Amino acid sequence: MATPTVATRLQRRVACISADDALGATLEAALPEGWAITRVTDIAALGDFADILQYRFLILDLDADAFDPLDVIDTLRREMMLNIAILCIGGDPAQRDAARLARADRFFERDAAVGVLQQFCGQYEW
């Protein structure tokens, strides 16, 4: 990505890190007007530090088998030292506890994903 500008920072974008195509398609269809979603299974596909900061928040699928969600959180928090909101979807209590210790922000059931997306899009609408 080119050097971030004020215009690119004001774009309303969210990243969904999940291998679940149905979840990604559902979230994409539920996006409010003016928002865009980037769906990936590898955090590196979002780019570097400055690229990831262009997203308002991230939705992370804790039920993923294609990647380790804890590695994603570790990369964002420890390696990149980013303080972007990480909203976790799914996962059992042990997965959620591990993600909480890794410094993920919020946790929701899979069936609440659309409502969570719309709620946070409203909060990050600036």
Positions of predicted regions on the chain:
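A short, hydrophobic beta-strand element within the central beta-sheet of small alpha/beta folds
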Residues: 83-93
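Conserved phosphotransfer cores of two-component systems
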Residues: 52-53, 76-82
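Short hydrophobic/Thr-rich beta-strand motif most characteristic of the beta2 strand and flanking loop
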Residues: 34-42
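Output/docking surface of receiver
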Residues: 93, 100-120
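Acidic, metal-coordinating helix/loop segments flanking the phosphotransfer/catalytic sites
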Residues: 41-57
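Conserved phosphotransfer microenvironments
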Residues: 56-77
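Short, structured coil segments at secondary-structure junctions
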Residues: 31-34, 82, 101-104
